[in-house]
Amino acid sequence: MPLKLVPSKPEEVPLMVETYFEAFSQDPIHQRFAPRGTQSARDFWTTSLSAEIRDENNHFLSVWDDSSTPETFVGFAKWIVPGASPEALPPADQWPSEGDQQFSVFFFGRLGEMHHEAMGKRPHWYLELVAVKPQYQGKGAASLMLKYGVNKADEDKVECFLDASPAGQPIYERYGFRVVQRDTFLDGTYVQCAMVRDARV
């Protein structure tokens, strides 16, 4: 399948938002904080991505299937460059109102703690988000976006970091990531992993 990796453009944000909802429609965490089909969740992601894609510290990537006419948007990823900090988490009342705002603050705050505990102040490339449409999952789109970041990290001779559910672990492990920390959520039914890829020096 001919997939094409390109830098994302601001005008692709609506496609990115829809892809996010499709990719995470079965994920209980994402459905709890940003329920699919709700206007507040759509507005939250549209506003967030529209701002973040204009920040030069964020490398947004898009994958397209150019075998179709017109081309089909397949997925996107966000890598954050070494030395840059992720955007500050919003207060509870700025998370999607139709989701669980207090849980959102708790969950994403905990992910931030795990990130800091794993990496401290060491420079690294951070894969903050990757989303691929369900019909394209397992067909190489995520690998294209992963390769971009790990190649950048190898050029810079620094580590990579990401957090993942167990479902995502196998592909990340193929690219040299290893689990350094785990935490459980939703009464122990959901496991989130902090994963690190060592620097290639």
Short names for language-model regions:
Residues 26-47:
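Conserved GNAT-fold acetyl-CoA-binding loop/helix
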Residues 4-18:
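A short beta-loop-alpha structural element at the N-terminal edge
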Residues 123-126, 152-164:
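Conserved GNAT acetyl-CoA-binding A-motif
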Residues 43-62, 84, 122-126, 190:
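A short helix-loop-beta-strand connector motif used in the catalytic cores of GNAT acetyltransferases and
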Residues 70-137, 186-190:
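Conserved acyl-donor/pantetheine-binding loop and adjacent beta-alpha core of acyl/acetyltransferases
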Residues 132, 138-151:
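Conserved acetyl-CoA-binding loop-helix of GNAT-fold acetyltransferases
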Residues 143, 155-157, 166-183, 188:
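Conserved active-site alpha-helix within GNAT-family acetyltransferase domains
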Residues 162-169, 185-201:
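C-terminal "cap" of GNAT-fold acetyltransferases
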